[in-house]
């Protein structure tokens, strides 16, 4: 058995061919939908990203009894249930909050995980703009990397 769970911030399903859109071409989503089960009666009760992810992974409504935060020790998450039944789970995410203090219990429930760096405030491969202390035309390094 293979299980793939896709979560996107700010992706409107009405812009996807599998949901009836005929003017935006999404061939990869169409092919994925042909081999997938769609949960089209699943609604998030909490729309901020971390609470919505907790709801989608556990089936528990988040904002009714708590605010933004990590998975709780009593949460039975979908990735953890699959993992405990010998189904390999892997998380690939650019959602930096999984790895920050206060949200760091989401990824531990998977067998393995990978963080795509560089989103939001993640300073990986980001340098503040540097200003040369002289006329830049006089610098030896002309490509702008100091």
For each feature predicted by the language model, list its residue ranges.
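Catalytic-site neighborhoods of secreted/periplasmic enzymes
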Residues: 53-146
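Short, surface-exposed acidic-centric catalytic microdomains
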Residues: 40-54
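Residue-level signal for pocket-adjacent positions within structured domains
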Residues: 11, 34, 38, 51-52, ...
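A short beta-strand-to-alpha-helix junction
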Residues: 22-25, 44, 69-76
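Conserved S-adenosyl-L-methionine
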Residues: 37-44, 88-94
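Short helix-loop boundary/capping segments at the starts of domains
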Residues: 13, 38, 62-66
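Active-site-proximal N-terminal segment of extracellular/periplasmic enzymes that hydrolyze or transfer
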Residues: 1-37, 46
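Short glycine/serine/threonine-biased micro-segments
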Residues: 18, 43, 57
């Amino acid at each position: 058995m293979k299980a793939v769970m896709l979560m996107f911030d700010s992706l409107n399903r009405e812009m996807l061919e599998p949901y009836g859109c005929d003017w935006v071409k999404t061939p990869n989503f169409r092919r994925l939908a042909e081999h997938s089960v769609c949960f089209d009666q699943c609604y998030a009760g909490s729309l901020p990203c971390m609470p919505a992810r907790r709801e989608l992974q556990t089936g528990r409504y988040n904002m009714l009894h708590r605010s933004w935060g990590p998975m709780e020790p009593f949460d039975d998450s979908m990735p953890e249930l699959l993992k405990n039944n010998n189904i390999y789970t892997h998380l690939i995410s650019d959602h930096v909050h999984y790895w920050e203090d206060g949200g760091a219990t989401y990824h531990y429930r998977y067998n393995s995980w990978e963080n795509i760096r560089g989103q939001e405030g993640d300073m990986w491969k980001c340098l503040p703009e540097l200003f040369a202390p002289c006329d830049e035309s006089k610098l030896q390094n002309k490509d702008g990397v100091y």
